[in-house]
């Protein structure tokens, strides 16, 4: 049975993670598998061992709230499989419930209790329906957030700060940290933030960065091919599109025909196939 293997940067992040944290990493760093590994180890599993270590039975139900695209393309299913987990009860090796759904449906899970939630592609901004549902879920369950882009403004952190109990609500946060410019009474603008040191400490408490240095070497090789020079010159002379059998009316149309003549060359296609062999 396959063991669970994490890379060094993923292990470092795993050791720093805690309930209510934000796992931050670029695309390709492995946030998904690291987040499931956190759930897996919290439920008794172990990573980087000689063989698969079973979680306690039954482990907590697992809910993954992600984008509709990731749900529909089953991206998370591939990561779950390493841990013998599946949204299909007949495939899942455990008796717990595993759900992968989109942010649009987060309201369906506000009554769930004593489960574990992974919120992927963090969409918690403002005070709309998603944020309200998130607050209800966070009170009764364990949870973590995944993002490639941490908040641009301190206001973006309000939902996570409130859910972690740092502030009672948005009003308290605003009263303690936000100074508005009221020149336009209908649309006040944030002028500055107060007590930023506290905000930095709170952010450092919950933000887990996945530091991953890519050690790759770029390889460039020029491959020279031929094309139909006579057809190329004829298109420029006659301003006639041989593919659509109609006149070329502008410069962009001529450039399109020239590119197509070059790219459709049999010599070019053969060279491309040889690269993939």
Regions found by a protein language model. Name each.
Residues 213-277:
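Conserved helicase/translocase motor-coupling segment
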Residues 60-61, 116, 133-215:
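Conserved P-loop NTPase motor "coupling/switch" region that bridges the ATPase
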């Amino acid at each position: 049975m396959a063991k669970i293997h994490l890379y060094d940067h993923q292990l470092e992040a795993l050791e720093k993670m805690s309930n209510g944290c934000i796992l931050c990493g670029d695309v390709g760093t492995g946030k998904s598998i690291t987040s499931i590994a956190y759930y897996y180890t919290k439920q008794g599993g172990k990573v980087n061992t000689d063989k698969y270590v079973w979680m306690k039975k039954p482990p907590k139900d697992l809910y993954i709230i992600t984008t509709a695209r990731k749900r529909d393309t089953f991206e998370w299913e591939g990561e779950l499989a390493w841990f013998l987990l599946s949204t299909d009860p007949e495939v899942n090796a455990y008796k717990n419930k595993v759900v992968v759904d989109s942010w649009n449906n987060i309201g369906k899970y506000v009554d769930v209790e004593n489960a574990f939630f992974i919120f992927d592609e963090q969409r918690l901004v403002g005070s709309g329906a998603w944020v309200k549902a998130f607050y209800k879920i966070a009170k009764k369950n364990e949870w973590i957030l995944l993002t490639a882009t941490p908040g641009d403004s301190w206001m973006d952190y309000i939902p996570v700060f409130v859910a972690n109990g740092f502030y009672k609500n948005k009003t308290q946060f605003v009263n303690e940290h936000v100074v508005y410019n009221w020149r336009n009474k209908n649309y006040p603008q944030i002028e500055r933030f107060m007590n930023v040191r506290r905000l930095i400490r709170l952010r450092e408490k919950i933000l887990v960065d996945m530091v991953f240095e890519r050690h790759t070497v770029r390889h460039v090789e020029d491959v020279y091919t031929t094309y139909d020079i006579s057809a190329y010159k004829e298109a420029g002379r006659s301003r006639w599109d041989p593919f659509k059998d109609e006149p070329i009316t502008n410069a962009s149309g001529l450039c399109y025909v020239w590119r197509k003549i070059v790219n459709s060359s049999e010599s070019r296609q053969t060279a491309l196939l040889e690269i993939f062999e």
